[in-house]
């Protein structure tokens, strides 16, 4: 009995059989780039861009420091303003209490005077 060997299909089919070819070409480009010893225009451009990125990072660091210092000053100003408002509020309430007590004292004095006047009027009748 001769058994024909059928080409076995893989259980999982690849959607695109050119995946290996794409991987090989990517590897070839990578190896070619590694083997290049000379500086090309592209690598020079990459170095320039890298330098620009370094300058940008330095600038951003300085800006962050300035913003932090500005934020600290703003927070200190807000704290001082809050303390001043609290002092004014306390002072206002103290004056209100003092005015109320003075008003009460005045009312008592007026009441006392009125009582004396009324008592004098009664005695005169």
Swiss-Prot record:
Residues 79-125 are annotated as: Disordered. This is Bublin coiled-coil protein. Keywords: Cell junction, Coiled coil, Cytoplasm, Cytoskeleton. It is found in: Cell junction; Cytoplasm, Cytoskeleton. Dynamic component of the endotube in intestinal cells, interacts with intermediate filament and regulates intestinal lumen morphology. Expressed in many epithelial tissues, including the pharynx, intestine, excretory canal and hypodermis. It comes from Caenorhabditis elegans. Disruption phenotype: Mutants are viable but developmentally delayed. They have bubble-shaped invaginations of the apical membrane into the cytoplasm of intestinal cells and abnormal aggregations of the subapical intermediate filament (IF) network. Residues 46-95 form a coiled coil. It comes from the Eukaryota. GO terms for biological process: intermediate filament bundle assembly. GO terms for molecular function: molecular adaptor activity. The gene is bbln-1. The keyword Coiled coil applies. The keyword Isomerase does not apply. One of its GO terms (cellular component) is cytoplasm.
